[in-house]
Amino acid sequence: MSQAAVVYWSGTGHTEAMAQAIAAAQADLFTAAEFDADKAAHYAAIAFGCPSMGAEQLEESEFEPMFEAVKPALAGKKIALFGSYGWGGGEWMRIWEDDCAAAGLTLCAESVICQDEPDDAALAACAALGEALK
């Protein structure tokens, strides 16, 4: 098991492609349904990825409940956020970053967002995010 994990939810495959680019830096890859607080305890660094859904929010049936459940186990860990969106300007990510700050979590790198399918620049930013988890 590596010291870093990448946990994501993807509806279209865009956020999954971002997760794979981040995990290429020797991180274990999990879907939101596969991850819980017990698994979080085994990692020093975790990147969480979720696309913007509905009215600029996290996916509500799988990802958000998982994230809320693991949040207490994230204190003192390197945390990073990423995701894709179809429209809007990325407000869901700013809300998510604020939620992490309110919970006392510190992000180890600037969050990575991209509109629709990640292009080469977004994939390069994801690779850099993966390196920041080391």
Report each predicted region and the residues it spans.
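FMN-binding flavodoxin-like domain, especially the glycine-rich phosphate-binding loop
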Residues: 2-4, 10-32, 37-134
